[in-house]
């Protein structure tokens, strides 16, 4: 972190002495720049092209040095469109890597890859900035203690618990509740952990980014009246931007998250949507730089690029960054190098199911497909592990019996199987939960359910103590006590109807 009172356009450091060069060649978003002998910029230094195009319009393009070519030339990748640039234009070496604003001033605001606000809410305090390229924390700084990151969401905490400082892959198509789940996690970490969140939109649709921003304002995650009380910072590098911007926007978001972890000593939630677009942008840049492609046309540095990003997402003795990354799987091929490289870094996977969403069970997290390395007796304890395994066994048996039920009906099942089906259906409904951020749509208040309460509830269902309760009593409630109250209300209502 650098206290930097001298920034030009937000995010570009001018601490170093300005050294001018000239554009020698332009190949799309890639520029070759010639500098005076002995005045060559370093790799990752930020270069600024300032001038006027042929129509007299002002141009300000920031680039990042990627290669030193020899003959006093460097090759740089532009972070914005290169329209209007011409050979011979002056290029300034800022003498430092790209730096972005960090700290409380980022909350409630939307930034681009350069750390410039793009939400028309005025300038941001840029006195405290941090370079986007940093080393991962040293071994001695790491917190190696395995601890569960409680989300207050029953299905996640019980069956696929998140690791504090871990990385979670979020798999889900359109319309299954990915955005609502993301917003609920942002809301819950702020309330239960006193933490903040950073959302990195990497190569996503501009419309989706706008929708997320509007929904966050509606649900109070972003506080319009008092912007400083907001719980999230947003960093966007959309699909229409050059590959350089899409490749670096993840690092911009991560840099903002690192400040909250290292300086403010907070637990931070970092969302990256979509991590595949980070790889895709890297592949485009690699081809533009003339590197030989590797397997399936990806960049030869795929593992290095992924590792340098993922290794910075970790727990230290100061705080933690827990990352939830949306993973697009090209053509549903899990062996594709991009998702395969991502899987190597994940501690847990949360799979959203269209089938559950169609049943109206939200969050539509698939309890059988979602996994976690944390679900071990020595980490979560025997009671939690046993309960989770029994829940999974019951749901798996129900899944196996569904074909028989569809053909022959429930009456053809044995007494034991009928009991299993009844309990599985109650478990399925009890895995649903009203969300705080969905209150404006559903009208029912959100519920945060602690892990101990979650385990107790599922143990009561599995033990058969609640077999007499109707299935409806388990749907969209918080803890098991609410189920009991709902069952009594349903009984009273049915008696009144009689």
UniProtKB/Swiss-Prot annotation:
Cellular compartments annotated: Plastid, Chloroplast thylakoid membrane
A molecular-function term among this protein's GO annotations: proton-transporting ATP synthase activity, rotational mechanism
- Reactions accelerated catalytically: ATP + H2O + 4 H(+)(in) = ADP + phosphate + 5 H(+)(out)
Checking Gene3D superfamilies in the record gives: 2.40.10.170, Bovine Mitochondrial F1-atpase, Atp Synthase Beta Chain, Chain D, domain 3, P-loop containing nucleotide triphosphate hydrolases
Name a GO CC annotation attached to this entry: chloroplast thylakoid membrane
Regarding protein family, the annotation reads: Belongs to the ATPase alpha/beta chains family.
Subunit-level organization: F-type ATPases have 2 components, CF(1) - the catalytic core - and CF(0) - the membrane proton channel. CF(1) has five subunits: alpha(3), beta(3), gamma(1), delta(1), epsilon(1). CF(0) has four main subunits: a(1), b(1), b'(1) and c(9-12).
Protein's name according to its UniProt entry: ATP synthase subunit beta, chloroplastic
Recorded source organism is: Brasenia schreberi (Water shield)
Q: Give the source lineage, highest ranks first.
A: Eukaryota, Viridiplantae, Streptophyta, Embryophyta, Tracheophyta
């Amino acid at each position: 972190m650098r206290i930097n009172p001298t920034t030009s356009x937000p995010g570009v450091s001018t601490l170093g002495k300005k050294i001018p060069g000239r554009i020698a060649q332009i190949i799309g978003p890639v520029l070759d720049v010639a500098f005076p002998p002995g005045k060559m910029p370093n790799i990752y230094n930020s270069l600024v092209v300032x001038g006027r195009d042929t129509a007299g319009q002002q141009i300000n393009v920031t680039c990042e040095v990627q290669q030193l070519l020899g003959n006093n030339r460097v090759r740089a990748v532009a972070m914005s469109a290169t329209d209007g640039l011409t050979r011979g234009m002056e290029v300034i070496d800022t003498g430092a890597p790209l730096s972005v604003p960090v700290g409380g001033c980022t909350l409630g605001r939307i930034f681009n890859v350069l750390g410039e606000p793009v939400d028309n809410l005025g300038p941001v305090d840029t006195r405290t900035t941090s370079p986007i390229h940093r080393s991962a924390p040293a071994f001695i700084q790491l917190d190696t203690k395995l601890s569960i990151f409680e989300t207050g969401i029953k299905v996640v905490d019980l069956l696929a618990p998140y690791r504090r400082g871990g990385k979670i892959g979020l798999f889900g198509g359109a319309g299954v509740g990915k955005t609502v789940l993301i917003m609920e996690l942002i809301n819950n970490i702020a309330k239960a952990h006193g933490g903040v969140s950073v959302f990195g939109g990497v190569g996503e649709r501009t419309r989706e980014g706008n929708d997320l921003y509007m929904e966050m304002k509606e649900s109070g995650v972003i506080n319009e009246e008092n912007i400083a009380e907001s719980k999230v910072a947003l960093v966007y590098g959309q699909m229409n931007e050059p590959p350089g911007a899409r490749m670096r926007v993840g690092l911009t978001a991560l840099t903002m998250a690192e400040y909250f972890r290292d300086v403010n000593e907070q637990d931070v939630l970092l969302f990256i949507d979509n991590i595949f677009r980070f790889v895709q942008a890297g592949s485009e840049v690699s081809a533009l730089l003339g590197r030989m492609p590797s397997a399936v046309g990806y960049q030869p540095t795929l593992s290095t690029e992924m590792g340098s990003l993922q290794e910075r997402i970790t727990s230290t003795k100061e705080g933690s960054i827990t990352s939830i990354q949306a993973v697009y799987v090209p053509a549903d091929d899990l062996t594709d190098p991009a998702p395969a490289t991502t899987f190597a870094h994940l501690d847990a996977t949360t799979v959203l199911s269209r089938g559950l969403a169609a049943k109206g069970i939200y969050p539509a997290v698939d309890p059988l497909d979602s996994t976690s390395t944390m679900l071990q007796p020595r980490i979560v304890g025997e009671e939690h592990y046993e309960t989770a395994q029994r829940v999974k066994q019951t749901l798996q048996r129900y899944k196996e019996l569904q074909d028989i039920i569809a053909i022959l009906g429930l009456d053809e099942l044995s007494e034991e199987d009928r009991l299993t089906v009844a309990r599985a259906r109650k478990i399925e409904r009890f895995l649903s939960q009203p969300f705080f951020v969905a209150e404006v749509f559903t009208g029912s208040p959100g519920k945060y359910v602690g892990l101990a309460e979650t385990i107790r509830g599922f143990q009561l269902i599995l033990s058969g103590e609640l077999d007499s309760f109707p299935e409806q009593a388990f749907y969209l409630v918080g803890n098991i006590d609410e189920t009991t109250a709902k069952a009594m209300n349903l009984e009273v209502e049915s008696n009144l109807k009689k």
